[in-house]
A protein has these predicted regions:
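Eukaryotic scaffold repeat domains enriched in small/polar residues
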Residues: 13-14, 19, 26-132
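N-terminal secretory signal peptides and thylakoid transit peptides that target proteins
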Residues: 1-14
Length: 132
């Protein structure tokens, strides 16, 4: 009889641990994608003061050879925003691309070059990732 009571008590105690696991679990963010390709949204990544660094429309993002994320926006206060992988703003530049829409990156030698397509000005610009 003691054995039966021990087993019942063990089951009840262990079941409680599984319930507590979900109670104290932290939300890891929304998951997007399908099949075996999924992405988790990090809502704290890259949060900036929109009065200082506004983003009108994010038309393109690329990763440079140093692992930094380059974001292109048609906001002429800062057409290019460069982030670390962790979401910290490293630099920003560009005020002359009102129709910034396409962004491609190409490594030439030891340097990355950005190709920015501006659909409003009907131009394609080649720059360094410092805007020169």
């Amino acid at each position: 009889m003691k054995r039966k009571a021990f087993i019942q008590q063990s089951i009840v105690s262990t079941g409680g641990l599984f319930l507590l696991k979900d109670t104290f679990a932290q939300d890891k963010g929304k998951v997007f994608g399908h099949n075996n390709i999924t992405y988790r949204l990090d809502e704290k990544w890259g949060q900036l003061d929109t009065n200082i660094h506004p983003v009108n429309d994010c038309h393109e993002m690329v990763q440079d050879s140093r692992g930094r994320i380059v974001l292109l926006t048609n906001e002429t206060k800062n057409n290019i925003l460069i982030y670390s992988k962790s979401g910290r703003l490293l630099s920003y530049w560009g005020t002359e691309y009102p129709g910034a829409h396409g962004l491609t990156i190409q490594k030439n030698g030891h340097e990355d070059f950005l190709f920015i397509t501006d659909t409003q000005l009907h131009q394609v610009y080649k720059t360094t990732n410092k805007g020169k």
